[in-house]
Structure formats: structure tokens, C-alpha cells
């Protein structure tokens, strides 16, 4: 887990802060769909703990798109252009770009459908019926497994799907997700799997994680008039180095009475 400042290299004059506070968590060394699900459970629990109830976590899978691109033999430049159009739900732009490409009409139809593949789990099942590409189907398998795990936690209703959500960050290698609520026009949480990123820092191990944008979360809480309970210190026990045992005993006494205690 971590908490710190992040600096974004975004476009100018958009009314957005270039410096934000983020808090989040990473699960390192686990490449399973169970690990994906655990991170999403943590996101949901974290948002609920602030008092939010009406929010959605949108799940995507970059490998579904990459499998289709690989099968179509599309070059990187065209793939990046198409990816941006799909993510922006620019149907006409997608159609225009595909008319310039040499590929079977069946493959073109799948790409044209991608901007529409958002909603509940039925959209994922529809996507499965649209392709026989092994890489893409493995991506669908992982999403369905994540849904099963979330359902077992009783949290399945908090998630939806968007196979047209394709991150501009190429280091993502599997599931990606963003959390939204009303009161802010931006995502509160962003995250995903990045199994090949840490090798650039000397550690070849899989990882999945997320970041909560604290300013956006606070804005949403304010606009929804949600007051978050803060645990304040009610008792402060000051002690000299040789009196630790006595101080700890006194702190335990206060805590059994339900009081928050800080030892100094």
C-alpha cells in the first residue's frame, strides 16, 4: 500500500490538476485471476468504507483487443489509431479507418462492435461468440473467472464491463479497470495488471494494482453530501523510555473502553 503525490503530464488548459494525491495498493508475485479479483474487492471495500454506495467499477481486458490485432496482422501505428477511436467510442472514425485496411470482413465487424461492448456480463459472453482467436478468448476466460469470484463475495453488482476501454499505457498486460461515481466527471480509481513492468526496474515478476485519486474522491463525497467518520485520538499517553510496559497497560485499559489511544 502507498500514499503520495503524483505528477501528471496532461494537456494544458483543461482545468485539471497536474499534481494529485494518490493512495493505492499492489499485489506482486501473483499472476492469477484470483489476484485480479482480490484487487477489485479491495477497491470496492475501500470506496464503501468512505461512505460511497453508488459507484461502478468498469472492467476491461487489453488482451482481447491485442489478440484481434495480432490475428488481423495490423501494424502498430494503425493499431494505436484504432485503439484511440474505439476508446473514444468514435464509431464513424473506426468504420472509416477499417475501410482502408485489408482484412476479412468478419474481422472488421468485430472491431466495429468493440465500442458497443460495454454493460453487464452478457456483453462478455457476446464477445466470446464473436471470435475464435485463442488470445482473445483467454482474456474472456479471465474476466468470467473474476466475475465468479466477485459474485462469491457478493460484490458482483458493483462491476460492469467495457471491452472498448483500452489504456494508452502499453505496459498493461491483462485486466484493466476504473471506478466511477456521480459528482465528478472523472474516474476515482484506475488500475490493472502489468506483468512486464517491474522487469524494467530489475525484478521480473507479475503485478496488479490500483490507485485512488484522493482529490476526486473527496470531491465526490462533498457533492454527494457524505460525511466520513474520522477516528480521532481521545487519549494520549506520554511515557519515558523506562515506563513502556506501564504505558502499554494504560493504553490497553483505555482501548477496552472503546477509546482511541496514541502512545508517545
Residue ranges and their predicted role:
Residues 2-52, 98-264:
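Positively charged, Gly/Ser-enriched RNA/tRNA-binding surfaces
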Residues 18-23, 59-67:
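Short, conserved phosphate-binding/catalytic loop or strand-edge motifs used
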Residues 50, 64-65, 78:
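Extended alpha-helical scaffolds
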Residues 54-64, 82, 160-164:
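Short, surface-exposed recognition loops or helix-turn segments adjacent to catalytic cores
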Residues 61, 89-90, 120:
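Short, solvent-exposed helix-helix connector turns and helix-capping sites enriched
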Residues 68-69, 73, 118:
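Active-site-proximal loop/short-helix segments
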Residues 73-96, 103, 155, 181:
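Acidic, His- and aromatic-enriched active-site or binding-groove loops in soluble protein domains
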Amino acid at each position: 500500500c502507498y500514499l503520495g503525490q503524483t505528477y501528471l503530464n496532461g494537456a494544458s488548459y483543461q482545468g485539471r490538476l497536474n499534481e494529485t494525491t494518490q493512495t493505492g495498493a499492489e499485489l506482486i508475485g501473483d499472476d492469477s485471476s484470483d489476484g485480479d479479483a482480490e484487487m477489485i474487492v479491495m477497491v470496492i471495500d475501500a470506496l464503501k468504507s468512505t461512505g460511497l454506495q453508488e459507484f461502478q467499477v468498469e472492467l476491461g481486458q487489453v488482451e482481447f483487443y491485442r489478440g484481434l490485432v495480432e490475428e488481423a496482422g495490423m501494424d502498430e501505428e494503425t493499431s494505436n489509431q484504432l485503439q484511440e477511436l474505439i476508446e473514444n467510442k468514435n464509431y464513424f472514425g473506426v468504420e472509416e479507418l477499417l475501410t482502408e485496411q485489408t482484412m476479412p470482413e468478419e474481422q472488421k465487424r468485430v472491431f466495429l462492435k468493440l465500442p458497443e461492448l460495454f454493460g453487464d456480463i452478457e456483453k462478455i459472453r457476446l464477445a466470446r461468440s464473436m471470435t475464435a482467436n485463442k488470445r482473445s478468448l483467454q482474456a474472456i476466460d479471465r474476466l468470467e473467472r473474476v466475475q465468479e469470484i466477485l459474485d462469491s463475495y457478493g460484490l458482483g453488482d458493483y462491476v460492469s464491463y467495457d471491452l472498448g476501454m483500452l489504456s494508452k499505457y502499453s505496459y498493461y498486460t491483462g485486466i484493466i479497470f476504473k471506478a466511477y461515481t456521480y459528482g465528478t466527471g472523472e474516474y476515482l480509481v484506475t488500475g490493472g495488471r502489468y506483468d512486464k513492468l517491474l522487469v524494467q526496474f530489475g525484478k521480473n515478476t507479475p503485478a496488479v494494482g490500483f490507485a485512488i485519486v484522493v482529490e476526486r474522491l473527496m470531491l465526490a463525497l462533498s457533492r454527494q453530501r457524505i460525511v466520513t467518520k474520522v477516528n480521532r485520538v481521545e487519549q494520549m499517553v506520554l511515557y519515558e523510555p523506562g515506563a513502556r510496559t506501564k504505558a502499554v497497560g494504560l493504553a490497553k485499559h483505555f482501548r477496552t473502553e472503546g477509546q482511541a489511544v496514541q502512545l508517545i
